[in-house]
Amino acid sequence: MSVTMREMLEAGVHFGHQTRFWNPKMAPFIFGHRNKIHIINLEKSLPMFQEAQKFAKQLAANRGTILMVGTKRQARELVAEQAQRAGVPYVDQRWLGGMLTNFKTVKTSIKRLKDMKAQQEAGLESMSKKEQLMFSRELEKLEKDIGGIQDMAALPDAIFVIDVGYHKIAVSEAKKLGIPLIGVVDSNHSPEGIDYVIPGNDDSAKAVALYARGIADAILEGRANAVTEVAKAVAAEGSDEFVEVDENAA
């Protein structure tokens, strides 16, 4: 689960955006600038990332759900891969407005997706070629839009977002509903309203991979710890002294 300063350096987490695009609210996390590019202070980023991991780990240990969001081209595959590894829902294509604030409607779409999958497995022989084509197109669209959240039965307990500016609608919906946010914030965006800020590069594929892997590791570790605790509790109960009662003693 641990991420080192060296790993952050190698992934280019410290490279911010051009100085002319900076957001002054990120000043506490900026070390300086080089060639008109802001350099993010990794001595701040590392402990803040570790804090975000700790939160994700505790949440997972308490059976909470974290929704991973990364729809930028360089993040899609990495986010989907790590979310699947951790067994959590994810959004990797586009954020549909109302995905959280109008979750009731989204659940209807999820049901439609699951019904269509079951229908496909049963066979589409009764449909005409044209009907099959229309069916396939609808299924493909639903899979693309909500495939990553099809097993999310309720609103998530937290959201992990790579690039809070790019995903401002997701951030806004989470804030409105009081859902805690873990967010990667680059030098050109504001960290305000983000519960667990990770100051860092949100464009580099290597940096994105590091964040996604780190959060997925924390989730898996939290879940594993919870299982271990349950096993210990069961073992402790089972070790209580067993006294056999002689039924003939009376």
From Swiss-Prot:
Keyword Lyase: no
Species assigned in the record: Acidovorax sp. (strain JS42)
UniProt entry tagged with the keyword Ribonucleoprotein: yes
GO BP terms in the entry: translation
Any one Gene Ontology molecular-function term assigned to this protein's record: structural constituent of ribosome
NCBIfam families: rpsB_bact (TIGR01011)
Any single Gene Ontology cellular-component annotation: cytosolic small ribosomal subunit
Full protein name: Small ribosomal subunit protein uS2
Taxonomy of the source species: Bacteria, Pseudomonadati, Pseudomonadota, Betaproteobacteria, Burkholderiales
Gene (UniProt): rpsB
Gene3D superfamilies: Glucose-6-phosphate isomerase like protein, domain 1, Helix hairpin bin
